[in-house]
């Protein structure tokens, strides 16, 4: 039991504010910051102790909040008002209605010890005595003790305040306040406040506040606040706050806050906050915060924060933070943070951080961090960090760090670190570190370190270290260290050390050491030491030592010693010694001695002697003598003599004679004669003649003739003729002719013809013809023709024709024709034709034709034709045609045709045709046709046709046809036709036809036809027809027809017909017909407005307004207004107003008003008013008023008023009033018909003396 506490009762405003502006909480502590222990209500909190005393300070408004709070008795001060005390702080225990608050005090007072003597402070009066004195007491609280003693309960109290047309249903202790037309239903102890037209349903202990037109459904203990037109549905304990037009659905104990037009769906224990127009969907325990226009979908216990326009999808227990326009998708337990425009996809328990515009895809337990514009893809357990614009792909449990613009691909359990712009590829368990712009490729468990711009490729368990720009390739278990710009290739378990710019190639178990710029190649277990810039090649178990810039090649068990810049090649057991810059090649057991700069090649048991700078090559038992700088190669038993600087190679029994500086190579029985500086190689029994500086290689029985500086290589039976500086290689029985500086390589039975500087390579039975500077490679039975500077590669049975500077690559049986500078790649049986600068890639059996600068990529059996600068990508069995600068992407079996600069993307079996600059996207089996600059997007089985600059979007099985500059959007099974510049939006199964510049919007199953510049909006199942410049708006199942420039608006099930320039507005179930220029307005029970000479026809309860010369027909309770010379007809209770020369006809209880020379007819109880020279006829109990010279006729009990010259006729008990004008004022002459009066049913007039007389018969 509480001994030092008391309960107080007080009221607050609906927003929980007290008279001093302090906001009281719904529960918990409230404190006054300006507390002063003086009497009076100011500078403190106040309340009625135990709920007994004066109720004058309490608010009795229906929306007041009744508060019960607990106060420390030692802090209380009694004030003058009976029962009221003042205190600095309190704890709110209950907030509800008056009844619920009193019930709370009654049920809990027993928990407190009543204080009989209580002082709040020095000089303060006795609180208890103050309570006992009091003025008047609360009626309810006066019975507290009696209620407790009797054990009775409080009666049910419901407060309902509503305006007309509303329906309120409240149960025990509920409060309902609503505007007109609202429907409110409340459970126990609930409070509902809503604007007009709203619908509220609340469970027990709920609070609902909403604007007009809103719909709220709340479980027990819920709180909802929403703007007009909103829809809120909440389960018990939920708290929803939303702007106008929003939709909120919440599970138990959820909190939703959203801007106008938003849509929120939340499971239990969720918290959602979003800007206007956003969409949020969350499972239980989620927390979502998003900007306007965003879309959030979250699993249980997730937290999402995103900027405007973003899209977030999260599994349970995920956290996402993203900038505007971003897209995030995550499985449970993930944490994503990304800048605007980014895309993040994460598996379970992953963490992603990325800058704007980045793309991240991660498996479970991954951590990705990337700068803007980067792309990261990782399997589970990976850790990636990369700069902007980088690309990272990682296997499970990998770690990647890279600078901007880098590309990383890693297997599982790998670690990669790279500078910007680098490329790294590694298998599992690898560790790569590289500078910017480097390329690293590593096998399992390898370690790579490289400077910027380097290239490293390593097998498993390798260790590579290289400076910038180096290239290293190693098998497993190798250790490579190289300076910048070096190239290293190593077999397993090798050790290589090289200076910068060196090249090393080693077999297993080798040790290579080289200076910078050197080249070393060694087989297993070799030991090579060379200076910088040297080249070494060694067999097994060899030892090579060479100075810088030397070249050494040794077989096993050889010993080579050479000065710097020398070249040595030796077989087993050889001993070579040469001066610097020399070249030595030795067979087994040979001995070679040469001066500096010499070249020697010897078979076994040979003896070579040469001056400095000479080259000698000899088979067994040969004797070679050459001058300085010469080169000699001899078969067995050969004898070679050459001048200084010459090169000779001879088979056995050969005779070689060469001038200084020449090179001769001959098989047995050959005879070679060459000028100075020439090179000749001949098969047996060959004859070679060459000018100075030429190079000739021939098989047996060959004839070679070459100009100075040329190179010729031929198999047996060949005939080669080439100009100076050319290179020719020919198979057997081939014929080659080439200009100066060309390179030709041909298999047997080939014929090659090439201009100067060209390169030709051909297999058997090929025919190649190319211009100067070209490169050609051909399979068997191929035919290639190419201009200067081109590159051609062809499989067998291919035909390639290319302009200068082009590149062609083709498999067997292909036919390629391209312009200069183009690039073509073709599969078997393909045909490619392309202009200059184009790029073509085709699968087998494809046909590609492209203009200059275009890019084409196609799978098998495709047919592509594009203009210059275009890009085409096609699946198999596709046909693409596009103008210059276009981009085409097609699935299999598609047909695409596009003008220049267009973009086309299509799934399989599609047919697209578009003009230049257009953009088309189509699902499978679609047909699209569009003019230049148009944009088309279609789902499957759709047909779209559009003029230039148009935009079309359609779902499946739609048919759209639109002129240039138009915009069309259609649901499935729709048909749209529109002129240029039009805008069309249609639901499914709709048919829209519109002229240029028109705007049409329709729900499903509608039919719209409109002229140019028109605007049409239709509900479902409607039919609209309009001329140009018209505006039509209709509800569902309406039929509207209008001429040009007209405006029609109708509700559901209406029929409107109007001429040009008309304006018709109608409610549901209306029928309006008007001529041109008319203005009709009709609602349900209709209202029409039309111009002159109009015809209006409407049903009951209608209002018609028309100009002169109009014809109006309406049912009962209608209002008709028209100009002069009109005809009006209405049913009972009609109101007719017309100008002069009009005819009005109406039923009973009608009111008719017309101008001069009019004819008015009405039923009983009617009122007729007309001008001069009119005829008025009415039934019983009617009132007729007319001007001069009129005829008034009515039934019994009627009142007739006429002026000078008028004739009045009425039935029994009627009143006739003649208004007589004497020049100064009117005088009324009154007569009654029937008993005591004049005779009824007789026509009366006034004579000159103002007497009532019978009208004489005419």
From Swiss-Prot:
Its main location: membrane. SUPFAM superfamilies: Phage fibre proteins. Pfam families: Ice_nucleation. GO terms for cellular component: cell outer membrane. Residues 260-287, 311-342, 356-383, 407-438, 452-480 are annotated as: Disordered. Keywords: Cell outer membrane, Ice nucleation, Membrane, Repeat. Contains 126 imperfect repeats of a consensus octapeptide A-G-Y-G-S-T-X-T; further on a 16-residue and a regional 48-residue periodicity is superimposed. This is Ice nucleation protein. The lineage of its organism: Bacteria, Pseudomonadati, Pseudomonadota, Gammaproteobacteria, Enterobacterales.
């Amino acid at each position: 039991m509480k001994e030092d506490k008391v309960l107080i009762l007080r009221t607050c405003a609906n927003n929980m504010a007290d008279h001093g502006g302090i906001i009281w909480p719904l529960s918990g502590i409230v404190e006054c910051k300006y507390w002063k222990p003086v009497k009076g209500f100011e500078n403190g909190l106040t309340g009625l102790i135990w709920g007994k005393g004066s109720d004058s300070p309490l608010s009795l408004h229906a929306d007041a909040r009744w508060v019960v709070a607990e106060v420390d008795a030692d802090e209380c001060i009694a004030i003058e008002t009976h029962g009221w005390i003042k205190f600095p702080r309190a704890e709110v225990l209950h907030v509800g209605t008056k009844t619920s608050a009193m019930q709370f005090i009654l049920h809990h007072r027993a928990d407190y010890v009543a204080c009989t003597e209580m002082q709040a402070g020095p000089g303060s009066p006795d609180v208890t005595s103050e309570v006992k004195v009091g003025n008047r007491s609360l009626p309810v609280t006066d019975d507290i003790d009696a209620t407790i003693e009797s054990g009775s309960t409080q009666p049910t109290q419901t407060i309902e305040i509503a305006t007309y047309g509303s329906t309120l249903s409240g149960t025990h202790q509920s409060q309902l306040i609503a505007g007109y037309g609202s429907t409110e239903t409340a459970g126990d102890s609930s409070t509902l406040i809503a604007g007009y037209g709203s619908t509220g349903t609340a469970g027990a202990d709920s609070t609902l506040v909403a604007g007009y037109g809103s719909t709220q459904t709340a479980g027990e203990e819920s709180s909802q606040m929403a703007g007009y037109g909103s829809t809120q549905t909440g389960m018990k304990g939920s708290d929803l706050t939303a702007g106008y037009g929003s939709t909120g659905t919440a599970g138990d104990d959820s909190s939703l806050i959203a801007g106008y037009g938003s849509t929120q769906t939340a499971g239990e224990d969720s918290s959602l906050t979003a800007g206007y127009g956003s969409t949020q969907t969350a499972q239980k325990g989620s927390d979502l915060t998003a900007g306007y226009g965003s879309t959030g979908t979250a699993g249980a216990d997730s937290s999402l924060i995103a900027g405007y326009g973003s899209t977030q999808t999260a599994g349970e227990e995920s956290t996402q933070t993203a900038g505007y326009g971003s897209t995030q998708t995550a499985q449970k337990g993930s944490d994503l943070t990304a800048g605007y425009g980014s895309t993040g996809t994460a598996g379970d328990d992953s963490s992603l951080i990325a800058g704007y515009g980045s793309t991240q895809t991660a498996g479970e337990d991954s951590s990705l961090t990337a700068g803007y514009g980067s792309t990261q893809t990782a399997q589970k357990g990976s850790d990636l960090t990369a700069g902007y614009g980088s690309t990272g792909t990682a296997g499970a449990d990998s770690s990647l760090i890279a600078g901007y613009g880098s590309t990383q691909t890693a297997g599982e359990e790998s670690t990669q670190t790279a500078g910007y712009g680098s490329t790294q590829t590694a298998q599992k368990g690898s560790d790569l570190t590289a500078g910017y712009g480097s390329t690293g490729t590593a096998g399992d468990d390898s370690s790579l370190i490289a400077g910027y711009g380097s290239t490293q490729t390593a097998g498993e368990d390798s260790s590579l270290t290289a400076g910038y720009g180096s290239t290293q390739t190693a098998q497993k278990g190798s250790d490579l260290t190289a300076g910048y710009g070096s190239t290293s290739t190593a077999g397993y378990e090798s050790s290589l050390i090289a200076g910068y710019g060196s090249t090393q190639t080693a077999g297993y178990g080798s040790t290579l050491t080289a200076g910078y710029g050197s080249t070393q190649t060694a087989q297993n277990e070799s030991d090579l030491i060379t200076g910088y810039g040297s080249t070494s090649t060694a067999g097994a178990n060899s030892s090579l030592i060479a100075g810088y810039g030397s070249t050494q090649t040794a077989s096993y068990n050889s010993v080579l010693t050479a000065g710097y810049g020398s070249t040595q090649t030796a077989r087993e057991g050889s001993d070579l010694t040469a001066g610097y810059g020399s070249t030595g090649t030795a067979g087994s057991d040979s001995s070679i001695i040469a001066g500096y700069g010499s070249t020697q090649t010897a078979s076994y048991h040979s003896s070579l002697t040469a001056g400095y700078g000479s080259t000698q090559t000899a088979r067994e038992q040969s004797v070679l003598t050459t001058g300085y700088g010469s080169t000699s190669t001899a078969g067995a038993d050969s004898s070679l003599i050459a001048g200084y600087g010459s090169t000779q190679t001879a088979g056995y029994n050969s005779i070689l004679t060469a001038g200084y500086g020449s090179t001769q190579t001959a098989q047995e029985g050959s005879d070679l004669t060459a000028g100075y500086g020439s090179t000749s190689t001949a098969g047996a029994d060959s004859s070679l003649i060459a000018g100075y500086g030429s190079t000739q290689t021939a098989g047996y029985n060959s004839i070679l003739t070459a100009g100075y500086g040329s190179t010729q290589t031929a198999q047996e039976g060949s005939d080669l003729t080439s100009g100076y500086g050319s290179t020719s290689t020919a198979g057997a029985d081939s014929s080659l002719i080439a200009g100066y500086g060309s390179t030709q390589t041909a298999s047997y039975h080939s014929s090659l013809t090439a201009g100067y500087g060209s390169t030709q390579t051909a297999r058997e039975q090929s025919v190649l013809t190319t211009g100067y500077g070209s490169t050609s490679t051909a399979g068997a039975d191929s035919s290639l023709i190419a201009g200067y500077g081109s590159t051609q590669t062809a499989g067998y049975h291919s035909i390639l024709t290319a302009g200068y500077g082009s590149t062609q690559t083709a498999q067997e049986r292909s036919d390629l024709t391209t312009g200069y500078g183009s690039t073509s790649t073709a599969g078997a049986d393909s045909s490619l034709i392309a202009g200059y600068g184009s790029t073509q890639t085709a699968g087998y059996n494809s046909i590609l034709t492209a203009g200059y600068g275009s890019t084409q990529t196609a799978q098998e059996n495709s047919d592509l034709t594009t203009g210059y600068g275009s890009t085409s990508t096609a699946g198999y069995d596709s046909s693409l045609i596009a103008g210059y600068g276009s981009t085409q992407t097609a699935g299999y079996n598609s047909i695409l045709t596009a003008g220049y600069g267009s973009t086309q993307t299509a799934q399989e079996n599609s047919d697209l045709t578009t003009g230049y600059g257009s953009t088309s996207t189509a699902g499978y089996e679609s047909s699209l046709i569009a003019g230049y600059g148009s944009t088309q997007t279609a789902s499957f089985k759709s047909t779209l046709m559009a003029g230039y600059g148009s935009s079309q979007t359609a779902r499946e099985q739609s048919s759209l046809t639109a002129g240039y500059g138009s915009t069309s959007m259609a649901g499935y099974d729709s048909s749209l036709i529109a002129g240029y510049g039009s805008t069309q939006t249609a639901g499914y199964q709709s048919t829209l036809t519109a002229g240029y510049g028109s705007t049409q919007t329709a729900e499903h199953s509608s039919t719209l036809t409109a002229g140019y510049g028109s605007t049409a909006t239709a509900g479902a199942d409607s039919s609209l027809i309009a001329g140009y410049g018209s505006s039509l708006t209709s509800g569902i199942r309406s039929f509207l027809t209008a001429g040009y420039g007209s405006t029609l608006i109708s509700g559901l099930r209406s029929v409107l017909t109007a001429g040009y320039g008309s304006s018709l507005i109608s409610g549901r179930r209306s029928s309006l017909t008007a001529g041109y220029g008319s203005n009709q307005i009709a609602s349900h029970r209709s209202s029409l407005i039309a111009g002159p000479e109009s015809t209006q026809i409407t049903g009951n309860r209608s209002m018609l307004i028309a100009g002169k010369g109009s014809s109006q027909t309406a049912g009962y309770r209608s209002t008709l207004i028209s100009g002069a010379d009109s005809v009006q007809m209405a049913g009972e209770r009609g109101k007719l107003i017309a100008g002069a020369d009009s005819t009005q006809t109406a039923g009973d209880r009608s009111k008719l008003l017309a101008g001069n020379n009019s004819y008015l007819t009405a039923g009983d109880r009617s009122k007729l008013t007309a001008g001069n020279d009119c005829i008025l006829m009415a039934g019983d109990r009617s009132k007729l008023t007319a001007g001069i010279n009129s005829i008034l006729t009515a039934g019994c009990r009627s009142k007739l008023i006429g002026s000078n010259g008028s004739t009045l006729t009425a039935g029994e008990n009627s009143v006739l009033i003649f208004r007589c004008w004497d020049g100064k004022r009117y005088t009324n002459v009154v007569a009654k018909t029937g008993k005591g009066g004049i005779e009824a049913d007789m026509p009366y007039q006034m004579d000159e003396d103002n007497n009532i007389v019978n009208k004489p018969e005419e």
